[in-house]
């Protein structure tokens, strides 16, 4: 997909994806874990006890969040431009490796607007959801 071709004819990006997928599966087989991104919903699609959440927010809420975490500037871009570029990269990566559409609600157990709820309430809702389904 991306990048130069490695020794086995696969791109370095494809090799990295496969290596990450293997590590994610190994960790998930050993113990409960939380994986953020890396197409983990797809990588772990055959794991029966997994939960998939998509955390999102408006661009304005996300800018406030990153600015509250300190100085945030990528390659001299504004926070909005950096977020838009990052979203485009995430979408392209996810869509390519999963064959699904990044952020589409029917791929997840739950989509949460953390911009409206805040981080703490979002975590509370996720924990409540997981705990209820584990019973």
Residue ranges of each PLM-predicted region?
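ATP-dependent small-molecule kinase phosphotransfer cores
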Residues: 1-32
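Short, amphipathic alpha-helical "lid/cap" segments that border enzyme active or binding sites
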Residues: 21, 119-127
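Small-molecule kinase domains that catalyze NTP-dependent phosphoryl transfer to phosphate-bearing small molecules
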Residues: 75-120
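Conserved phosphate-donor/acceptor-positioning beta-strand/loop module used by diverse small-molecule
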Residues: 46-69, 76-85
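Short, polar loop motifs at secondary-structure junctions
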Residues: 37-42
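RNA pseudouridine synthases
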Residues: 27, 43-47
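Short, charged, intrinsically disordered terminal tails
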Residues: 128-135
